[in-house]
UniProtKB/Swiss-Prot annotation:
Source taxon at top rank: Eukaryota
Signal peptide range: none
Region spans: Disordered: 1-137, 352-373, 463-673, 749-804, 827-899, 1082-1151, 1396-1420, 1442-1462, 1484-1527, 1550-1583, 1763-1898, 1930-1960
Chain's gene name: Znf638
InterPro entries xref list: Matrin/U1-C_Znf_C2H2, Matrin/U1-like-C_Znf_C2H2, Nucleotide-bd_a/b_plait_sf, RBD_domain_sf, RRM_dom, ZNF638_RRM1/2, Znf_C2H2_jaz, Znf_C2H2_sf
Pro residues: compositionally biased ranges: 19-31
Keyword vocabulary terms for this entry: Activator, DNA-binding, Isopeptide bond, Metal-binding, Methylation, Nucleus, Phosphoprotein, Repeat, Repressor, Transcription, Transcription regulation, Ubl conjugation, Zinc, Zinc-finger
Annotated source species: Mus musculus
Name this polypeptide is given: Zinc finger protein 638
Zinc finger motifs (Matrin-type), residue ranges: 1876-1906
SMART domains associated with the record: RRM, ZnF_C2H2, ZnF_U1
Length: 1960
């Protein structure tokens, strides 16, 4: 029978029992259901149906008839009865029950019991009346048979105590007996099933049966029976039952029909008829069965068959045969539900958690739903009846309803309720799970999910989304069509529920615990309690129960719905558990219930309300309990299913549940909860999870519960301890709490004020305090602050505004400004502006210290500045994390409090899977973090925290080790010297750890800092780094999005830096920012300073007063910072970046230049002395951001300056000597640049200011004139002053410039935005006014020049020295260069100022650009470079000017010279910028060489500053050439030679200078101040080499540029210089036909200042550009010669044009550049000499050129050096000749040609164009350097285009004179950018080629710039790859073209030479 019965089941889809039970039938039936266990088996088989079946199963055995009917209804019963056919179906179905029972005994163990159960379910329904009447022996045997037992088993039954043998417990006992019997027969199966049931029985078998019935009936009265029943039956039954139930449930639907077919309709009808009789007759059996069904209906043996049958019936037969059964089953089902509920509840009570959890989750919910849907009234009444009479309530309809619901075990498994006993057999999948982990994994398997889906399909009437209460609801609404409604929602809900529960359990053990409890035991208890109340009420009346159900349904809030809730509430034990689980939701609902108690908890609970409840109104324990209990019945089951249900998403429900938990606990411990609940608001809008909240708060203590309110981005958090809340609140006061990268607000629900706000306020207060401290410290500058406050309204330049900015964590410029208030602060602030908010704040703290210590702190300020520079790198990350900013701000007060901070070192972090927040959380409990640095690349982290906190943290984690992602963290104290701001120090420490032998001192120049990396951008950056060489090491700071790469060589680092500067790389949306190690610059500066100290008389003075230096630094920083502040503020308006760069130029320049302190001293001294010389007011005045303010506050600024100047004055008193004046000159230069911006911004005001300052400046200049050296330097200063004045008026400019410089410093920041427009106006306005002054100043300059002539070496050295006294701080290699640069910078600064004024818009963009390119050193470096340029140009040019006649050449050539100087300085600045970017490596090398060469440079400076530059490039060649002649040494260095040629040509022949587009521009500039410019260029190149070595690639760039122009684009430095100066000249040259030079300059400036480039581009032709490029491509010598020939030709042409066409124009500018004019005179003299020298060198020293080229090769390491050398031996000679000819002869003609050649070449590949002359040179050099050059060239082109795109357009439009004018503007800008001249010089030289190209084709620049590749200017071919280019260079075609080109160049050189000679 069992098999036949099983076979019918086998037909059922869900008949799992077959598989699990070898007997086949036995597993389904006997699993648990035949016996006491049999019922459980049934409910698994058909959860809904199984429950009813089980009840009938018990009754059916008592009344066989009903059973048969049920059997007929359910084929499973039919099978058992078929096996028991001996009994007539009509025969007392009791008999059938008995025979059945006997058969069940044998087969029931196998499967019949299941079928019997199924039949018995209907029978039970039928039997219920019988039970009511009486039961006979037959009925007893039928009952036994229904449980798969025989009479023999009664003996075992007699062993049970009498008190347990109650009708309610009997099904449980019988199931237990049967399970034991089955376990004996089927040891494997029973043990398996039994274990399973043990695990899931609670949840599955007994729970399922009782679950559904008990939950519906709310029976809690049979706990004892339940206990008895649960122990054995549930386990086996559950296991067996689950499988059979699933299979049965699936099969039952079909078998029901089959059963009907198998059994005569009569049988079924008999059974259906009998049910009433059998039910009444076999009251006990029915009762027992009912009880079992009540308990087991969800899954007991007797009920199992019924379940299967009922399932099938409910699915198929239920409507067919069950239609008749349905009404009875409806009646009986309620009864069976009651009985089952009672029995199960008792069993559960006995089993307690096991059954109760299973039943609560699965059965009760299911039963309730079914019952509610199908037989609400019967169920309700059955409760009363269940207790009073079982039969009447169990109708066939009830049975069908039961059948319509899966068994509780199935439901439990469906809901993924965690079984209480393991191993657990999944009733849906027949898979055994030995552990909870296995069960959780199984829940997530596709098999289980599919089984759940099939279960929903199998029970269409069962809506898994509707919990019992909802079932009632659905019953009311869908009594008629429960299947559809429940069916459609069921899949969704079930999925949600199953997934939700699984997730929950997996998410949090607490939830998990709650869930299982709530699911099985708790639900059972809840249901029991509910059912008790319900049963009571139901017994009272069915309708009330229904009404309750209806109430529950409609409101969906069981809690508020009925008095049962109250009674349930009274039953607290269950409800407390439910409270903990389901109550979580009720917590949401608790408030809701409070607010809307009548509303359904789920519906009523809104996320917002939930949090309100949780946070604000914590319901009393009673209200919570009531709500929870109410919600418990439905809500807890709802917690399972309702969470899945429509009311709330699982997440929301979970949240609600969590909140409920949180509230429950608070309710339990109201005082505790009230104090232990936190409201977390302002959570991330992009989503957050409970885990995120827990992670953030876990460090403070255990978290009892979390309630999420996503709609409001809030969460309620309950901590177990009040102390945790207190510690959290305290922590929040000091540090923001960050969740997923966002600071959140945390407050106690009663307290709405989030503490984060307080925290924010505190940081703001801190900022305020710091701001106030700054203000206090700068009390003298308070007036300025006030003034600047008015101006700060415009640009936020005022410190107060800065403070505000800082408060906002907003504007780096603002913070920089505030920092600027203090000199050291200024520096730090500048860097801070760069770095970002965090670095700014960090700098602030440093600045505060600086304020406290003011000037003495200057040196510390420098260190701080270094830190800030590091911070810059990390600034972005800091900005990214506002907490970091707050921390930084807080650091200041902490520092003020002098709290000892320690660094905690954390190592062994996991590779991935952790966030910075998690590391923060490690330290949060111990105190506020000051800073954190996570080195994800090294799996390490550093946390800066209060020392006490650090100690306790280390001790705690030592005692209680913590692991992260399986890695046990090692937490210890870091060494005391560790500074998180000094990232390089940390990096070097790590390097030493890995490689103790590593030479850390020489490793910094190999560091490349990359900022703004995406989180996953490390690999991309490493790939980028590997393109420039091997990346030896790297350190990735994930929390700062920064990485430091250590490349294999400084050249690689420099190349990468230059490339990334020119071609910013994007990784996703992140634009990488690249910087070099600030220590490299400082080291170079120190070396240069040492050299300067040796060679310069002034440097010793500076060094003699180190205190003064620091003071000077402080004063100079404050003053220079102030101008930069102004610039920065103005720039901040333009762009914070630009302003930051400008400030950094002024402030960071010192920092980089000489550890910031040295260079800062130089700058400070320069500024301070400049302030003295020109009047202290200017510097201070410059501090006020606005010109207006400045003019208004000149007095105030003077006072402020006095404050700052107090230091300055000290220095000045000490440095009263010429050196001081030199320093003043430098400061003037700096100020000039600022003035340029200011003048440009507000010309009229500036003029007034200038006029006000002119006198003092003139006086100062006069004083300077008194000292030759000083006069030289001062002329530089005067020149600088006049440089703007030259545009305006040289003389006025001189005095005004000093004033204007200071004013401009202030104005520049403020007006830099307006600088461009204003510059034009100022130029126009001031040119006139300053012409007179310019003339006077020219005379002075001429005198100075004469003095220089007399003491060229001395003054050069002296100049270099004083400048370096000042510059020493800035750069070591600048010792010679610095002086040259100082003077040249003065000139170039003046020129730059002029250029700036002339092309105000361009100049503005140029300085900002240049500054942006070379952030730190540009302003000062520009000034120095300009000074050097001018000094070199002066000294070298003065020599030449002396030769050519300074006065005449000055007066005549001054316009041209001014343009040239501008161009040169501009070029230099541009080139320096470019070169610093591109050729930092070369610069470094050269700088090192220069360090050794400074004396030579000094000599060369005395001989020729160009020579000094040459010395910078090649000390040997420089020495030889310097001994030969000033010009020869220039030629001795190939680049120098080129520069010399260009400069000489330009100096000698403005027209020649014009001829050479690249160097022609320089030449034009040189014509304006040709020799000085060219010399400056060369010297700049030379100096720029050391300078860049020092940290400013700009100085080294000239030589390097010369060298690397061939080798790399950096050769363009000269071009850049020329371009910078010639951008001014460009405008002039545009007006004049000499714009070719301008083109170069513009191109170079375009690199530096894009606007000028387009103009030049327009002028230069591609052919000329190509020619120039070809020349340059050859080698440094070739390039130098060729460029000189070409450039000189162009320069000569342009210079001539400038002189001719632009002289008038320039003459107007000449007043601006009186010093420049002097420089021009000097340059011209020098250019004459130098040019003569160049010609001599060219003619005499092609060999020298080759030697120079060889030297260049050595320095540049060009592969083509040999080839180039060979070619240059012949080609260079020819080139030299060509250069001479070009310089002399090919002015206009060749100028055009070369412009064409150079321009295309330049635009495409500056570096390549350099190689162009010699294919070998191109191949070797360019192979090495072309990538850099090309990139640099293109990048400069980009810059040209970008910065000067509009000017480039203008270039085409304006006349050549206009171009020259614009060029002069660009030059000024470039000069302003001279801080970056090294890079830009090289770039400019290279980019001058590129720029000439750019000039010719402004549009091409854009295209060429973004596109990487190599362009052969000689062949006009473009190659995308370096190899292709190299191959091309080696090709015969290229060689032939090169030869042709060289031949042309030779001719041009000859022509140029002739022209130059004639021009001389």
């Amino acid at each position: 029978m069992s098999r036949p019965r099983f076979n019918p089941r086998g037909t059922f889809p869900l008949q799992r029992p077959r598989a699990p039970n070898p007997p086949g039938m036995r597993p389904p039936g006997p699993f648990v259901r035949p016996g006491s266990m049999g019922l459980p088996r049934f409910y698994p088989a058909g959860r809904a149906r199984g429950i009813p079946h089980r009840f009938p199963g018990h009754g059916s055995y008592q009344n066989m008839g009903p059973q048969r009917m049920n059997v007929q209804v359910t084929q499973h019963r039919t099978d058992p009865r078929l096996t028991k056919e001996k009994l007539d179906f009509p025969e007392a179905q009791q008999k059938k029950g008995k025979p059945h029972g006997s058969r069940w005994d044998d087969e029931s163990h196998i499967t019949p019991p299941v079928e019997v159960k199924q039949s018995s379910v209907t029978q039970v329904t039928e039997q219920s009346p019988k039970v009511q009447s009486r039961y006979t022996k037959e009925s007893a045997s039928s009952i036994l048979a229904s449980f798969g037992l025989s009479n023999e088993d009664l003996e075992e039954l007699s062993r049970y105590p009498d008190e347990q043998l109650t009708p309610e417990n009997m099904p449980l006992i019988l199931r237990d007996i049967r399970m034991r019997k089955m376990s004996r027969r089927l040891p494997n199966l029973p043990s398996h099933s039994r274990n399973k049931e043990t695990l899931s029985n609670e949840t599955v078998s007994s729970n399922v049966i009782d679950y559904g019935h008990a939950s519906k009936y709310g029976y809690t009265e049979d706990p004892l029976e339940v206990r008895i029943y649960d122990p054995e039956i549930p386990t086996d039954e559950v296991k067996n039952e689950f499988q059979p139930q699933q299979s049965i449930s699936a099969t039952v639907s079909t078998p029901n029909v089959i059963c009907n077919s198998v059994f005569p309709g009569g049988d079924m009808f008999r059974q259906m008829d009998f049910p009433g009789e059998s039910s009444s007759q076999s009251f006990f059996p029915v009762e027992s069965g009912t009880k079992m069904s009540g308990l087991h209906i969800s899954g007991q043996s007797v009920l199992e068959p019924v379940k299967s049958i009922s399932q099938s019936i409910s699915q198929t037969v239920s409507q067919t045969t069950s239609q008749s059964l349905n009404p009875p089953s409806m009646n009986q089902v309620p009864f069976t539900f009651e009985l089952d509920a009672v029995l199960r509840q008792q069993e559960r009570i006995s089993q307690k958690s096991v059954i109760s959890s299973a039943d609560a989750h699965g059965g009760p919910t299911e039963s309730k739903k079914d019952y509610q849907s199908e037989a609400d009234l019967p169920i309700r009444s059955p409760f009363g009846i269940v207790k009073a009479s079982w039969l009447p309530k169990f109708t066939q309809a009830g049975a069908q309803k039961m059948k319509r619901l899966p068994t509780p075990s199935m439901m439990n498994d469906y809901y993924a309720a965690s079984p209480r006993i393991f191993p657990h057999l999944c009733s849906l999948c027949n898979v055994e799970c030995s552990h909870l982990k296995d069960w959780i994994q199984h829940q997530n398997t596709s098999t289980h999910i599919e089984s759940c889906r099939q279960l929903r399909q199998q029970y269409p009437d069962w809506n898994p989304e509707i919990l019992p209460s909802r079932r009632n609801e659905s019953n009311r609404k869908e009594n008629e069509t429960p299947r559809r409604r429940s069916h459609s929602p069921s899949p969704r809900h079930s999925r949600r529920s199953s997934s939700g529960h699984r997730i929950r359990r997996s998410r949090s053990p607490v939830r998990y615990i709650y869930r299982p409890r709530s699911r099985s035991p708790r639900i059972c208890h809840r249901f029991i309690s509910k059912y008790r109340s319900r049963s009571r009420s139901r017994s009272r009346s069915r309708s009330p129960y229904r009404s309750r159900n209806l109430l529950r349904r409609s409101p969906k809030s069981y809690r508020s719905a009925s008095p049962e809730r109250t009674s349930r509430k009274s039953v607290r034990s269950d409800r407390k558990k439910a409270l903990e689980d389901g109550g979580q939701r009720s917590v949401h609902g608790t408030e809701v219930t409070k607010q809307k108690h009548t509303e359904t908890v789920d519906k009523g609970l809104s996320p917002a309300q939930k949090p309100k409840l949780a946070s604000g109104t914590k319901p009393s324990a009673k209200s919570l309990s009531s709500v929870k209990s109410d919600s418990h019945l439905g809500a807890y089951s709802a917690h399972k299913s309702e969470n899945l249900e429509d009311d709330t998403l699982p997440e929301g429900k979970q949240e609600s549940g969590k909140s409920a938990l949180a509230q429950r606990k608070p309710q339990k411990d109201q005082s505790l909860s009230s104090n232990s609940i936190l409201l977390v608001s302002e959570l991330p809008e992009d989503g957050f999870t409970e885990e995120d909240i827990r992670k953030a708060f876990l460090p403070f203590g255990k978290i009892s519960d979390v309630l999420l309110v996503p709609c409001r981005n809030e969460a309620y958090l309950e901590m177990e301890l009040r102390k945790a809340v207190t510690s959290i609140m305290k922590y929040i006061e000091t540090m923001p709490l960050v969740i997923k990268g966002k600071s959140v607000k945390v407050c106690v629900p009663g307290k709405k004020k989030p503490q984060n706000k307080e925290m924010k306020k505190k940081p703001s207060d801190i900022k305020k305090s710091s701001a106030s401290a700054l203000k206090k410290e700068t009390d003298a500058s308070k007036t300025m602050e006030t003034v600047s406050s008015s101006s700060s309204a415009k640009s936020g330049q005022i410190k107060s505004s800065t403070v505000k900015v800082n408060k906002c964590a907003g504007k780096s410029a603002g913070s920089v400004k505030s920092v600027v208030t203090v000199a050291a602060k200024g520096k730090a602030s500048i860097k801070t502006a760069k770095s970002g908010k965090k670095s700014l704040e960090a700098k602030k703290s440093g600045n505060i210290k600086n304020k406290d210590s003011n000037k003495p702190v200057t040196v510390p300020a420098n260190s701080e500045i270094k830190a800030s520079s590091e911070d810059k790198a990390t600034g972005k990350s800091a900005e990214e994390s506002p907490s970091g900013t707050l921390e930084a701000t807080e650091k200041e007060p902490v520092n003020k409090e002098s709290e000892e901070m320690s660094v905690v070192f954390i190592s062994n972090l996991p590779n991935k899977g952790y966030s910075t927040e998690e590391i923060y959380n490690l330290a949060k409990p111990f105190g506020a973090l000051k800073d954190i640095l996570v080195l994800s690349s090294h799996k390490k982290a550093y946390i800066e925290i209060n020392k006490k906190s650090a100690d306790s943290m280390v001790k705690f984690y030592t005692c209680f080790p913590i692991s992260m992602d399986g890695n046990q963290l090692s937490i210890s104290m870091a060494p005391e010297h560790v500074d998180l701001k000094d990232e390089e120090a940390l990096f070097t420490t790590l390097i030493q750890e890995n490689d103790p032998e590593a030479n850390i001192d020489k490793i910094y120049n190999r560091f490349v800092h990359l900022d703004n990396l995406p989180e996953d951008g490390l690999q991309c950056v490493l790939c980028v780094g590997h393109q420039f060489g091997k990346v030896d090491r790297y350190m990735f700071m994930s929390n700062k999005n920064k990485v430091i790469l250590q490349l294999e060589s400084p050249e690689s680092a420099l190349s990468m830096y230059n490339f990334l500067k020119q071609n910013p790389q994007n990784i996703g949306e992140h634009v990488l920012t690249c910087t070099l190690s600030p220590k490299t610059d400082s080291e170079v500066q120190r070396k240069n300073d040492l050299e300067l100290g040796k060679g310069s008389t002034f440097s010793p003075d500076l060094k003699n007063s180190p205190v003064d230096e620091s003071e000077v630094q402080t004063a100079a920083d404050s003053s220079s910072v102030k101008p930069s502040e102004v610039e920065e503020e103005t720039t901040s308006n333009i762009g914070t970046e630009t302003s930051v760069h400008q400030e950094e130029l002024g402030k960071e320049e010192p920092k980089q230049a000489l550890c910031e302190s040295d260079f800062a001293i130089q700058t400070l001294e320069l500024e301070a002395q400049g302030a003295e010389v020109s009047i202290e007011i200017p510097l201070v005045a410059s501090t006020p951001a606005n010109i207006e303010l400045f003019s208004e506050n000149i007095d105030e600024s003077a006072l402020n300056q006095q404050m700052y100047t107090s230091d300055f004055e000290k220095e000045e008193a000490e440095v009263t000597n010429p050196e001081t004046e030199l320093a003043v000159s430098d400061s003037v230069f700096i100020e000039e640049r600022n003035i340029k911006g200011i003048i440009e911004d507000s010309p009229s005001e500036t003029e007034d200011i200038f006029s006000g300052i002119v006198q003092p400046m003139v006086d100062a200049i006069a004083e300077v004139d008194k000292h030759e050296t000083v006069s030289e330097v001062l002329p530089s200063a005067c020149n600088v002053t006049q440089a703007p004045g030259s545009y305006i008026e040289d003389e006025k400019v001189v005095s005004k410039k000093d004033i204007a410089e200071k004013v401009i410093l202030d104005e520049k920041e403020e007006d830099e935005f307006n600088v461009k427009e204003t510059r034009m106006d100022l130029q126009v306005k001031t040119e006139k006014a300053e012409k007179n002054e310019a003339i006077i100043f020219k005379e002075k300059l001429e005198k100075i020049i004469a003095a220089i002539r007399e003491k060229p070496i001395e003054s050069s050295v002296i100049k270099a020295d004083p400048t370096k006294g000042l510059d020493q701080t800035s750069k070591p290699d600048e010792t010679g260069k610095s002086s040259v640069l100082t003077v040249s910078n003065v000139y170039s600064s003046k020129s730059s100022i002029k250029a700036t004024v002339v092309s105000s818009p361009k100049a503005k963009s140029t300085p900002s650009k240049t500054e942006s390119h070379s952030t730190f050193p540009k302003p000062v470096l520009r000034e120095q470079i300009k000074a050097d340029k001018k000094v070199s140009a002066k000294e070298f040019g003065l020599l030449k000017n002396t030769r050519s006649g300074l006065a005449e050449s000055n007066s005549k050539s001054k316009p041209t010279q001014i343009g040239v100087n501008r161009g040169c300085s501009g070029r230099i600045s541009a080139l320096q910028c470019k070169d610093s970017k591109v050729d930092y490596k070369d610069i470094t090398k050269q700088s090192q060489e220069t360090e050794t060469k400074p004396p030579i440079m000094k000599r060369d400076d005395s001989n020729n500053k160009a020579l000094a530059l040459q010395n910078t490039k090649n000390s040997k060649s420089t020495t030889d050439r310097s001994s030969k002649s000033k010009e020869e040494p220039l030629f001795t260095f190939n680049l120098d030679e080129f520069v010399t040629v260009d400069e000489v040509i330009e100096e000698v022949n403005p027209s020649q200078a014009k001829q050479n587009p690249l160097k022609g521009k320089r030449k034009e500039a040189l014509k304006i101040s040709p020799s000085p410019e060219l010399n400056l260029k060369k010297k700049k190149g030379k100096t720029s080499v050391p300078h860049s070595v020092e940290g400013e690639l700009s100085f080294v760039t000239l030589d390097e540029i010369g060298e690397e122009e061939d080798a790399t684009v950096q050769a363009l430095v000269t071009v850049d210089e020329v371009i910078d100066e010639e951008e001014l000249n460009m405008e002039e040259m545009v007006k004049n036909s000499n714009s070719l030079l301008t083109l170069d300059e513009l191109i170079d400036q375009d690199d530096c200042i894009p606007h000028s480039g387009p103009k030049d581009v327009t002028v230069l032709s591609m052919a000329e550009e190509q020619d120039l490029q070809q020349e340059r491509l050859v080698t440094v010598d070739e390039i130098g010669e060729v460029e000189e020939s070409a450039d000189i030709t162009f320069a000569t042409l342009n210079a001539k044009r400038d002189k001719r066409d632009s002289i008038g124009f320039i003459s107007s500018q000449m007043p601006e550049d009186p010093s420049t004019l002097v420089t021009v005179d000097e340059i011209q003299d020098d250019s004459s000499d130098f040019h003569l020298m160049t010609l001599d060198e060219v003619t005499e020293e092609d060999e020298n050129s080759l030697a120079d080229f060889n030297n260049l090769k050595e320095e540049l390491n060009f592969v083509t050096v040999d080839e180039v050398g060979d070619e240059e031996d012949g080609d260079n000679d020819s080139k030299v000749e060509l250069a001479r000819g070009k310089i002399e002869h090919h002015t206009d003609k060749k100028g055009n040609r070369k412009r064409r050649a150079v321009d295309p070449k330049k635009s495409k590949l500056d570096s390549f164009s350099q190689v162009g002359p010699g294919s070998e040179t191109v191949t070797q050099k360019d192979l090495k350097t072309m990538p850099e050059r090309h990139l640099a060239a293109k990048t400069p082109m980009k810059r040209v285009r970008l910065g000067k795109s509009s000017p480039s357009q203008k270039v085409a439009e304006p006349t050549k004179g206009e171009e020259a004018f614009q060029m002069s503007e660009g030059v000024d800008d470039a000069e302003l950018k001279d801080s970056e001249p090294d890079e830009k010089r090289r770039k400019t030289q290279d980019s001058s080629v590129g720029k000439s190209m750019t000039s010719d084709v402004p549009g091409d620049l854009d295209f060429l710039v973004p596109k990487a590749g190599f362009f052969c200017p000689i062949c006009s071919l473009f190659y995308s790859g370096e190899k292709a280019m190299a191959n091309h260079c080696k090709s015969t075609r290229h060689k032939q073209n090169t030869e042709k080109f060289m031949a042309k160049q030779r001719k041009e050189k000859e022509q140029n030479e002739t022209e130059e000679r004639s021009s001389r």
